[in-house]
Amino acid sequence: MPFNEDNLKFILGFKLKNLRLQRGYSLKDVATRANMSISYLSEIEKGKKYPKAEKLLALANCYEVGYDELVTVDGQDNLNPLAESLESGFFQEFPFQLFGLQAADLFSLLTTSPDKAGALIRTFLEIGQMYDVRVEHFLFAALRAYQKMHNNYFEDLELAAESFLESDIWGGKPVNEINLRRYLEVNGRYIIDETLLADHPTLHSFRSVFIPGKRPRLFLNKRLLPSQKAFIFGKEIGTRLLGIETRATTSSWIKVESFEQVLNNYRTSYFAGALLIGRTKVVGGLSQLFNQKTWDPVGFLGLMKSLDSTPEMFFYRIGQLAHNYFGLSSHYFMRLAKRDSEDFIDVSKMLNLSTIPLPRGFSNSENYCRKWAGMKLLADRTWERGIAFPDLPARSGPTAQAQRSNFANTGQEVFSFAVSRAMQLSPSDDSAVILGFPMDDALKSVIRFWDDPALKDQLVGIT
């Protein structure tokens, strides 16, 4: 089994610490016998250093083992779980530095008791196989932790978007699909194709596909809304301005290759949101709505329309600005999808930056779940479609709802907003997005209509 340099450091450190504990030596004892400093030996055992051959020979003599036994990794049972974990991708891909750690820091914890470490690693590997937990699950969990650490708000990306719009090269033009596309074609030498994806037998569900080159090619699904196309163009501009090289090439994930790729995708999405939906307009519009004593769904959807935003983009943007501008410290976002031919409602996207437990899917046969705001909107769309915007086709007209909820299993209280509409790439199916906040004192001081009598209190559950 091949090992990279870092993994060899980990394995050597594991073996040396194991030998020292078996012999009952202290670091000082080994330092004296091998003529090395205690600090250097400690670095080796932590997997941070790999000594030269003469020092390895001195350590082999100290422990009375052969040189080859010290440097080879095959045929030793107590090393098998460590070797498996190192090659699993977790140690290689997980962004330890994001949390002020290195892989060696975790390794040093595991090597305190080699036998127990082996059992622990075997347990994690078995659980991962049983529940199909892959490295990308850890990477997306790390991204959520990163967002939570920063309250889902990034001033550098806000400023980057505003700086671009104020630049001479943009020239104060309206931020729309046409102008963003033109910028990419002229300044990025992009070739943009809207003919291939929509009718392609396997790629028709993709919003975009990117192919790098001297003249980058961007394939765009022609069935997208102008605002959705503008968002994709905004991400491409963000990729260029932020100097990003490691990126996803498709709108939907096919393979997650690294945390850098996951983080960069988030950063370009954030940039695009800040570019298209400026924080000043969002904060101003929401402040007016939140100051009202009654819930105004038409006004809520009107603000979304004035920002030329899809429900998902609108809710994501609110979530990014909620803490910094409204003092709402935690929230969750969910996107529900319901196919016309099925009763089951799938949770197709979730971002939980709260302590509230969330479901992975809904069934019409579950009484508590039918009372979720987004669930109810999907059920009611047959007669609610088009109420807010009669000028739009009835099937695509968005509908909105606000709700006070009490979780049956935990007693937690939540205030949530939901917007539903038809799916753009599959008009016979519907989707709904939900943005929820814990109903604490901060929320009650910001959203004045939290106790609007017209809003019913609902007892909801996650099953």
List the model feature ranges, each with a label:
Residues 1-6:
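N-terminal intrinsically disordered/low-complexity leader segments
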Residues 8-11, 18, 22, 28, ...:
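Short juxta-domain linker segments that transition from a proline/glycine-rich
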